[in-house]
């Protein structure tokens, strides 16, 4: 049975380097790894706890099912104002109110920019609060070297 990884780019930008990382991971995955590239961040409504009930918005339901069906998550996030993008945080907020889809799930975090350390730390803290398992990230210096 293949390992299923849900890969998410935290950017909506057309020429996003984080989306390029996610697409490269999908293209280079070994045969025993299935990469499900999630491209629905723009479709998610703004998080509102009052709307976190049945019937769920179809985009929210789709995100939750895809996280539930994944063995692990791979998130590549840009950094905006020393934090993660609003659309990525919005998606994570929708997972807080779910049925624990992300609890205990391994999550790998990467940033395509070498100076995105604040977003990495912010995202790691959010995911710890959500009880996911931090699978570590790739630390590198300003030149991109580990």
Question: Predicted regions span which residues?
Answer:
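Residues at the starts of beta-strands that form the adenosine-phosphate
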Residues: 4, 34, 106
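N-terminal beta-loop-helix "entrance" segment that forms/cooperates
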Residues: 40-57
């Amino acid at each position: 049975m293949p390992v299923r990884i849900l890969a998410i780019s935290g950017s909506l930008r057309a020429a996003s380097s984080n989306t390029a990382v996610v697409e490269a991971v999908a293209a280079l995955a070994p045969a025993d790894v299935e990469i499900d590239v999630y491209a629905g961040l723009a479709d998610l409504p703004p998080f509102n706890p009052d709307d976190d009930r049945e019937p769920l918005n179809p985009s929210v339901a789709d995100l939750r099912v895809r996280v539930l069906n994944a063995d692990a998550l791979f998130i590549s996030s840009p950094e905006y104002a020393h934090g993660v993008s609003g659309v990525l945080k919005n998606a994570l907020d929708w997972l807080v109110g779910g049925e624990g889809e992300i609890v205990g799930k391994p999550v790998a975090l990467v940033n395509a920019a070498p100076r995105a350390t604040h977003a990495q730390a912010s995202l790691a803290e959010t995911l710890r609060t959500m009880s996911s398992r931090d699978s570590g990230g790739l630390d590198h210096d300003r030149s991109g070297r580990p």
